[in-house]
Curated annotation (Swiss-Prot):
Cellular compartment(s): Cytoplasm
Main function: Increases the formation of ribosomal termination complexes and stimulates activities of RF-1 and RF-2. It binds guanine nucleotides and has strong preference for UGA stop codons. It may interact directly with the ribosome. The stimulation of RF-1 and RF-2 is significantly reduced by GTP and GDP, but not by GMP.
Organism: Lacticaseibacillus casei (strain BL23)
UniProt: GTP binding residues: 20-27, 88-92, 142-145
Name of the protein in question: Peptide chain release factor 3
Superkingdom of the source species: Bacteria
Record GO terms (molecular function): GTP binding; GTPase activity; translation release factor activity, codon nonspecific; translation release factor activity, codon specific
Any one GO cellular component localisation term in the record: cytosol
Length: 524
């Protein structure tokens, strides 16, 4: 591909993640976006446990049963001349590590907030990560079809709790049973609720008001809306694209994903204002531009058994620069070895199509036979490239894991190896006895691991809790196995690095007092 062609293709890419607290309606809005992208013909009510409909983005068996997202799905489609890459992320807090890594692979984020509840705990956590990255954040205030909090309070909360300016792109005319429509400040029109096609749009005059002949003008809620708009115009934040690009201001859209109200307006604005792929920093201190003709990418996720019939593993890579071509040779930075990328795919949750070419900003799945690790960099060219490390969390909960049937050791070990490589749970082995210990950020990760071991590898496992522990790594040169005591457990991680699992903070303090020269470290 010629340089000008590459630049043109890269400029079409819009790659973003959707973040929210559980049940704010993230999966529902994802489905509506796919509907506009022409990818699906109908959007089911997403809690599949009751309706029998399953969200397109919830593809794993346990997700369908429980109505929660526990993996990051990737969905791609074309819309208005742009190539959209959506990364749907787990809303459940136990899967925040997977979500954090996903946020490293996007150029923007969409924050979905339940307008009845406002900003919730998980949204706060995820917002922090997006804020640290300095990428644009677009806010969708969802569930307008239900009674919720005052819109002015919701805008104020963005500033008070998250420290980001909010600019209302549209404004609700009523809510719940009294919802009449949306006042569109950008397109200077009113979008009526429960109307189809262009009939739902009413133009505003130069004063920002409807023609007096319109029935809505007789409604007191319309008058209240005009007062709110006047207040926003006089005392609210001014739209500032520079601030939006820096992640200092968020455009706020109101709507209802369930009734598909306000979603199309949101998508059109998002495509218009969201950034195209930008440069990415390297460990060497430089940065790689997306229009650099030499291919480079990084692995942000590994997923086993997306197709249970084939027991496959897919490494999800974000292309940072250049053009991907199936069959190309690349260098894996961690090993220095050259490898050929023959098998590649693009996604719609669990369905996939072979992809022959892709460019910077795209997400590609590579069939993995065990070569890749999360955070790996692959590249072409003479100059070695390694992108910045992805975040890794220190687990807080630990269990000892054994196979229930000792005759099924082979499937037990295969399942352990593949699921641990996905990064949702961490694997440790005790010194001398080589017992398997699993670590996780939350209890749900263990439940998902147990479920998948049984259903995907036919290996029933016994998990014995060893409680909440504090994990601290130690320099191998300073390690003496006599340091292990009843207050700590000496283990090694999958890289062979030693660490102690302390019973509590007192045990860690006792250790620090006894061995003042020993340095212990945590992950994130």
């Amino acid at each position: 591909m010629k340089p000008q062609e590459l630049a043109k293709e890269v400029a079409k890419r819009r790659t973003f993640a959707i973040i929210s607290h559980p049940d704010a309606g993230k999966t529902t809005i994802t489905e509506q976006l796919l509907l506009f992208g022409g990818v699906i013909r109908e959007a089911g009510t997403v809690k599949g446990r009751k309706s029998g409909h399953f969200a397109k983005s919830d593809w794993m068996e346990i997700e369908k049963k429980r109505g929660i997202s526990v993996t990051s799905s990737v969905m791609q489609f074309n819309y208005q001349g742009k190539r959209i890459n959506i990364l749907d992320t787990p809303g459940h807090e136990d899967f925040s590590e997977d979500t954090y890594r996903t946020l490293m692979a996007v150029d923007a984020a969409v924050m979905v907030i339940d307008s009845a509840k406002g900003i919730e705990a998980q949204t706060k956590k995820l917002f922090k990560v997006v804020k640290q990255r300095g990428i644009p954040i677009f806010t969708f205030m969802n569930k307008l079809d239900r009674d919720g909090r005052e819109p002015l309070d919701l805008i104020a909360e963005l500033e008070d709790l998250l420290g980001i300016e909010g600019y209302a792109m549209n404004w609700p005319i009523g809510m719940g049973k009294g919802l009449k429509g949306l006042y569109d400040r950008v397109n200077q029109r009113i979008e009526l609720y429960r109307r189809e096609g262009d009939d739902r749009f009413l133009p505003l005059n130069d004063q920002g008001q409807l023609d007096p002949s319109q029935p809505l003008t007789q409604d007191s809620i319309y008058t209240q809306t005009l007062d709110d708009i006047e207040l926003l115009n006089d005392a609210g934040n001014q739209f500032n694209l520079k601030k939006i690009m820096a992640g200092e201001q968020t455009p706020v859209f109101f709507g209802s994903a369930l009734t598909n109200f306000g979603v199309e307006t949101f998508l059109n604005s998002f495509v218009q204002y969201a950034p195209e792929p930008g440069p990415k920093k390297t460990e060497q201190g430089g940065e790689v531009n997306p229009t650099n003709p030499e291919f480079s990418a990084f692995v942000f996720k590994i997923q086993a058994n997306m197709n249970p019939a084939h027991r496959d593993r897919i490494a999800f890579v974000r292309i940072v620069s250049g053009e991907f071509e199936r069959g190309m040779d690349v260098i894996l930075h961690r090993t220095g070895k050259t490898m050929r990328l023959n098998n590649s795919t693009e996604f719609m949750a669990d369905t996939r199509e072979t992809v022959s070419t892709a460019v910077a900003g795209d997400i590609v799945g590579l069939y993995d036979t065990g070569n890749f690790q999360i955070g790996d960099t692959i590249y072409q060219g003479k100059e070695p490239i390694q992108f910045e490390k992805l975040p890794q969390f220190t687990p807080e909960l630990f269990v000892r894991v054994t196979p229930k049937n000792v005759m099924k050791q082979k499937s037990f070990h295969k399942g352990m190896q593949q699921l641990v490589q996905e990064g949702a749970v961490q694997l440790y082995k005790t010194y001398n006895t080589n017992d398997y210990i699993l670590g996780a950020v939350g209890q749900l990760q263990f439940e998902v691991f147990q479920f998948r071991m049984l259903h995907e590898y036919h290996s029933e496992v016994i998990m014995t809790p060893i409680g909440s522990r504090t994990a601290r790594w130690i320099n191998p040169d300073q390690l003496d196995e006599k340091m292990s005591s009843s207050r700590n457990l000496l283990v090694q991680d999958i890289h062979g690095d030693p660490l102690f699992l302390f019973e509590n903070q007192y045990a860690e303090r006792w250790f620090a007092d006894k061995y003042p020269d020993v340095k212990l470290t945590a992950k994130m």
